[in-house]
Amino acid sequence: MQKKKLIYLLLACSMFLQASLAVQAKINYKLPSLEEIQTSNKDMKVDALIEKLPVTAHSNDPLLKLVNKNNPNSDKEEPELAWDSYGYIYHKDLVKPLEDLMEAAAKDGFYYRVVSGYRSVEEQENNRNLSIQNYLAQGLSQADAESVTNQYFAPADASEHTTGLAIDLLGTEWLDNGGELEASYSETDSAKWLANNAHRFGFILRYQQNKESITGYNFEPWHFRYVGKVHAGFIYENGLTLEEYLALLAKKESN
């Protein structure tokens, strides 16, 4: 009997260790150094910023999953998805927050449409290929076409859209006037409303202006990422990217 108990105990310990290692591996991201972090408050030291981090925040929060060129998406399973009335798909956790955002925006006279949500790895690869072919048709060389595409289209396994937590939002007025996914969208009132209010509903402007060296992507005023209200509030208030926020959390957790 004692021997059986010992075996069960060893098995339990082994399972716990494996689970712990799995979590550690999952959050072993390639992140910017603390010296690279650029906060909107120039007088705020990194140590002070770390002290201010939300008490409940932890880098293994699934809503903080980092996917970029340096951290490809290793998940093989499709995320839990939901469909909106236009047929766009995104993570089920976005349904209520996005509805709340749309409702609040409408009260202020702004209306939006999701133009892109969840994309599978295969869809992302197709989008990249279409972009390259489009630039080739415009007369660019293969190398230049791929270079320009890489500025806006992540490698197939390195797109946030594969998590279902990222959406591309554009104002309906902008779309009705023929507007597309362009940086100039940021000059419109609807884009400014999103940039200044999305955090209230748990979303962050993912690819900020002048943060290209951190995110690896050009400014995209339409691309928003759901991280939850607590994280989004801190990120917005301090002018951070997700990469920078995770770097701060990693430092805090290592102490």
Label for each model-derived stretch:
Residues 18-255:
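Extracytoplasmic cell-surface/polysaccharide-interacting catalytic and binding patches
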Residues 1-25:
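Sec-dependent N-terminal signal peptides of Gram-positive bacterial secreted proteins and lipoproteins
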